[in-house]
């Protein structure tokens, strides 16, 4: 039985191959992984289900991979047994750091491209990551069974980018299984075996960790040097914390405990820790006694790029929201949150996310898995504000914008790569310029496809940039971005005043040129949403003390003359004067209650409504 060879660990490194699959969303990565699981016999036919490795409901429903997964596969070539570790990576731009860690655990990568669509921006971004790590790239075209597939054209495009011959590009179909056995043979032939010192102190890199309700944190590692055995004390090198190894094993594709892991092997550890933040992705694990002195390179803390406030619609759900966020954080070390209060929305949390998809998925999981109704404020980025008196403030929430004289404001910028059919160049450039973008360069990948490189302020992207890009290019363009420092900008805070009082939930930090438009848009929208009162209510948009836009909600007037039939004019005048006095008094002491629905509509319709060009 060849399967038993893969079940024993401490395999000779020359017979191990570690590889991952790089692909854009929807190019069939998880389906190809399914075929590999079936071909190698790791998963029985009856236990098989589509997208076997995507465990979360949300992953299966949206068809995206969020958490990296790994599987140990047995395979025979030329009468020799080999062990392959397939590490399944997320394809989305928000999870680039996870991808880079997963790539660190491999020696080779399958570059998978849809034969009907060609290469996309995120595939390119991940390909460059893989080339940085000196991985062996095996170019593969998937979905060749599709009627729309054009393998010859895209094989030439792929060969041009990777630098090989079009005939070297393998052609497979993850759906029907055509070409997959040949692909596995190629992996064994082309991917170099792992290199490591078996006698050195143990060093293993964490490339993922997940929280299991019953067993605590399960940490996935790739052993680089030495070996790890159960009941041994281990140390995390970034935090210095020590834990006892309760269980160690391989994933095939269900976890199987073993008596340890050797050089080049990929598997899991369980230490009984309850918090994912203690086993950080990218950290180095070593033995507590006689451990390694130098950690493996490349670890960095995940940094939130986008902030948004989350508030329960019903205030009594606040403790539930806190528990839910705590549980999600067990599984997602990149999510950060701090409690905050808003005069308008009550108690809630300010949450930090890696990007827009991360934010959307977190929100959806809170609503679905924990059954919460949430309002989320418009997303914003982190600003650095220098004041005239030399103090410096870091602003994650428009309400905390410092009062007083501002000397400089810095905002984060990102480098964007957009790949699109060449007929859309004009409208893409127009879109990027309207978002304060600077063109960095442009290359033709083939006659019909072009790559544009832009530097854009992060704040311009997080709103609806992606949607606008898709609608201008009929859905053909793809986008990838990476952070690249900060730049000084002319930014101002726009407050929305009701009856002269600022409403914190509607404040926004926008570029000076877009402030007028934002103010006008919000005041008009609120005029429609806030119910009429007994007295006139002014809605104003202001920068500091300067009003830049105003709308009025007209008063509702009761007909006080209804009871006077005929009668003297002075009687009527008396009643009207009395009403006028009352309105005046009301106006000075009256409060405007903004209904919850108006908040939800004003904050959310920003994202869906008339897609303003100038919105931050």
Swiss-Prot record:
Domain of life of the source: Bacteria
Pfam families referenced in this protein's UniProt entry, alphabetically: EFG_C, GTP_EFTU, GTP_EFTU_D2, LepA_C
Gene Ontology biological-process annotations: positive regulation of translation
Disulphides: none
SUPFAM superfamilies: EF-G C-terminal domain-like (SSF54980), P-loop containing nucleoside triphosphate hydrolases (SSF52540), Translation proteins (SSF50447)
Organism: Nocardia farcinica (strain IFM 10152)
Keyword hit for NAD: no
Keywords: Cell membrane, GTP-binding, Hydrolase, Membrane, Nucleotide-binding, Protein biosynthesis
HAMAP family, alphabetized: LepA
GO molecular function, one term: GTPase activity
Catalytic activity entry: GTP + H2O = GDP + phosphate + H(+)
Name of the protein in its database record: Elongation factor 4
Membrane topology value: Peripheral membrane protein
Main location (coarse class): membrane
């Amino acid at each position: 039985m060849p399967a038993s060879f893969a079940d024993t660990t401490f395999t000779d490194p020359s017979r191990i191959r570690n590889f991952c699959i790089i692909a854009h969303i929807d190019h069939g990565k998880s389906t190809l992984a399914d075929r590999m699981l079936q071909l190698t016999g790791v998963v029985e036919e009856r236990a098989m289900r589509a997208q076997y490795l995507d465990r979360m409901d949300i992953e299966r429903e949206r068809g995206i991979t969020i958490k990296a997964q790994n599987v140990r596969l047995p395979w025979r070539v030329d009468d020799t047994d080999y062990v392959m570790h397939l590490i399944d990576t997320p394809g989305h731009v928000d999870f680039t750091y996870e991808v880079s860690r997963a790539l660190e655990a491999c020696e080779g990568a399958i570059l998978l491209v849809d034969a009907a669509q060609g290469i996309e921006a995120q595939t390119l971004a991940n390909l460059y990551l893989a080339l940085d790590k000196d991985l062996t790239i095996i170019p593969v075209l998937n979905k060749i069974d599709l009627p729309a597939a054009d393998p010859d054209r895209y094989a030439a495009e792929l060969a041009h980018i990777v630098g090989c011959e079009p005939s070297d590009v393998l052609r497979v179909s993850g759906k029907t299984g055509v070409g997959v056995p040949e692909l596995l043979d190629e992996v064994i032939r082309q991917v170099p075996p792992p290199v490591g010192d078996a006698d050195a102190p143990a060093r293993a890199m964490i490339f993922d960790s997940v929280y299991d309700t019953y067993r605590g944190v399960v940490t996935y590692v790739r052993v680089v040097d030495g070996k790890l055995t159960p009941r041994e004390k281990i140390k995390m090198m970034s935090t210095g914390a020590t834990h006892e190894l309760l269980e160690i094993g391989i994933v095939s594709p269900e976890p199987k405990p073993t008596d340890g892991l050797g050089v080049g092997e990929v598997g899991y550890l369980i230490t009984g820790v309850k918090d994912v933040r203690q086993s950080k992705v990218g950290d180095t694990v070593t033995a507590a006694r006689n451990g390694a002195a130098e950690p493996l390179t490349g670890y960095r803390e995940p940094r939130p790029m986008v902030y948004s406030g989350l508030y329960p619609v019903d205030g009594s759900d606040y403790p539930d929201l806190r528990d839910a966020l705590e549980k999600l954080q067990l599984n997602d070390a990149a999510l950060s949150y701090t409690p905050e209060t808003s005069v308008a929305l009550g108690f809630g949390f300010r949450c930090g996310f890696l990007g827009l998809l991360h934010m959307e998925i977190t929100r959806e999981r809170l609503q679905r898995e924990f059954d919460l109704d949430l309002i989320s404020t418009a997303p914003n980025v982190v600003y650095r504000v220098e004041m005239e008196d030399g103090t410096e403030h870091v602003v994650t929430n428009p309400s905390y914008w410092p009062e007083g004289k501002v000397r400089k404001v810095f905002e984060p910028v990102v480098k964007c790569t957009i790949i699109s059919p060449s007929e859309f160049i004009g409208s893409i450039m127009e879109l990027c310029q309207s978002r304060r973008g600077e063109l960095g360069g442009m290359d033709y990948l083939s006659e019909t496809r072009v790559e544009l490189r832009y530097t854009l302020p992060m704040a311009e992207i997080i709103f609806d940039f992606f949607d606008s890009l898709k609608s201008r290019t009929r859905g053909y363009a793809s986008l990838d971005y990476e952070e690249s420092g900060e730049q000084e900008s002319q930014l101002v805070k726009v407050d929305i005043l009701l009856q002269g009082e600022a409403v914190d939930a509607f404040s926004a930090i926008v570029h000076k040129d877009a402030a007028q438009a934002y103010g006008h848009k919000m005041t008009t929208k609120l005029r429609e949403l806030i119910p009429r009162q007994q007295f006139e209510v002014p809605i104003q948009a202001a920068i500091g003390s300067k009003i830049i836009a105003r709308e009025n909600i007209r008063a509702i007037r009761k007909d006080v003359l209804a009871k006077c039939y005929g009668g003297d004019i002075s009687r009527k005048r008396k009643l009207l004067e009395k009403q006028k006095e009352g309105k005046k008094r009301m106006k000075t002491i009256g409060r405007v209650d903004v209904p919850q629905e108006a908040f939800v509509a004003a904050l959310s319709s920003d994202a869906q409504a008339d897609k303003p060009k100038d919105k931050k």
